[in-house]
Amino acid sequence: MDLLLLEKALLGLFAAAVVAIAVSKLRGKRFKLPPGPLGFPVFGNWLQVGDDLNQRKLANLSKKFGDVYLLRMGQRNLVVVSSPEMAKEVLHTQGVEFGSRTRNVVFDIFTGKGQDMVFTVYSEHWRKMRRIMTVPFFTNKVVQQQRFNWEDEAARVVEDVKKDPQAATTGIVLRRRLQLLMYNNMYRIMFDRRFESVDDPLFNKLKALNGERSRLAQSFEYNYGDFIPILRPFLRGYLKLVKEVKERRLKLFKDYFVEERKKLTSTKSMTEENFKCAIDHVLDAQQKGEINEDNVLYIVENINVAAIETTLWSIEWGIAELVNHPDIQKKLRAEIDRVLGPDHQITEPDTHKLPYLQAVIKETLRLRMAIPLLVPHMNLNDAKLAGYDIPAESKILVNAWWLANNPAHWKDPQVFRPERFLEEESGVEANGNDFRYIPFGVGRRSCPGIILALPILGITIGRMVQNFELLPPPGQSKIDTSEKGGQFSLFILNHSTIVLKPRSSV
């Protein structure tokens, strides 16, 4: 470690401590802040709560400090919202005031300081990007056009699994094949392209770079430099790696996909009537001067981050729960057989005729929420919430997982029981009609990908159950469903081997 750098950092910490104490006293007199644990100068509550602010830890803190509480993470304010009423206030009633996104050193690099749509602040730029992305990605028309591709990809998974002799005996790690399915689902929407197999070199290069991006962005390793800016020089090596990964990914998106699509369409007279894929619409917006080339690449980046992995996690969670709950799996299979018969494979329209399948998907999203704290919100200006003052640029976390797993609001929430959505919770939908259950968020900054995720989940999980008996490996009664979280994600720690026995009647 550079001794001069260390000396400067220590002096900076001392100065920051003095300033923090003074500011804290002034702020306490000026603001009525939400309750929270007493913190230390400079570090705030960071030393007490640690880096991993997972949904369970935050839920436990809410039992002590209430539905709205404040954590000081170094020099950053973090406000945690833990009730349906306060979630409605943040996401709906005051959706404009709390409609921005927080910034940090790593996401600033990966998004070009907010040139994307998902992670940018609430502004005219966000409205423009949302509008440009909606037509080619997030409409019912897209679902009806693309459902045949999703059904085709699910059929290919079934075919590949049946060809693998290990699948029905010792088992396979199904996630690898499902990952290809999700990439193909989204790349067919974006570029009218697909990857032929899990061994495709371009697919593996893309998957590796996206995986590295995910690891770097979701890691807690860089928190100290984000919470305490004076320590940021110690992040130089980390941020250098982030920049390298960002540049390699954007170059890959540009060279292998965007430019290839441009070449393909350059010989044709392109009008909206003959646009074949989403990037055609996006490039048209660029040609009209609405966005620039960087914006185009960050749209591709957003889809890779926000659509592929999150839906994959939910598919994996759903299948894992069905493996570990054979009675539920049998009940779902019986519904499919009864409604569709033996010779008809599930299609997107069929999923709406299968209420138990819909309940299984809802229950998966409730118990195993892929983004349990939603994507963090931020208020650009000073705001009020529940009678408390919320200082400008506070990071707002809505603990959506706790809203959907609080025993005060749900019967036996720790139990995987799809029947709840056919019985006492039959009126609850994933679109946010009940603030106890908001897996995709609500309001202006809700996830528009819900319109794609729900049918893909229904088709994929439905086809797996329709064609196979899903079992744990020989000698095991269940598969491991231990959780692993990142900055705001929740996925399975170990990608388990499962046995898939083909059904003789299908």
From Swiss-Prot:
* UniProt pathway annotation: Phenylpropanoid metabolism; trans-4-coumarate biosynthesis; trans-4-coumarate from trans-cinnamate: step 1/1
Question: Per the entry, which co-factors are needed?
Answer: heme
- Heme recorded as keyword: yes
The record gives the membrane topology as: Single-pass membrane protein
Which UniProt keywords are given for this protein, alphabetically ordered? Heme, Iron, Membrane, Metal-binding, Monooxygenase, Oxidoreductase, Transmembrane, Transmembrane helix
- Phylogenetic placement of the source organism: Eukaryota, Viridiplantae, Streptophyta, Embryophyta, Tracheophyta
- Gene behind this chain? CYP73A2
Q: Which family does it belong to?
A: Belongs to the cytochrome P450 family.
Q: What is this protein called?
A: Trans-cinnamate 4-monooxygenase
InterPro entries recorded: Cyt_P450 (IPR001128), Cyt_P450_CS (IPR017972), Cyt_P450_E_grp-I (IPR002401), Cyt_P450_sf (IPR036396)
Q: Name one GO cellular component term.
A: membrane
Q: Does the keyword Transmembrane apply?
A: yes
Q: What does this protein do?
A: Catalyzes the first oxidative step of the phenylpropanoid pathway in higher plants by transforming trans-cinnamate into p-coumarate. The compounds formed by this pathway are essential components for lignification, pollination, and defense against ultraviolet light, predators and pathogens.
Q: Indicate where this protein resides in the cell.
A: Membrane
Q: Which reaction does it catalyse?
A: (E)-cinnamate + reduced [NADPH--hemoprotein reductase] + O2 = (E)-4-coumarate + oxidized [NADPH--hemoprotein reductase] + H2O + H(+)
User: Which source organism?
Assistant: Ruta graveolens
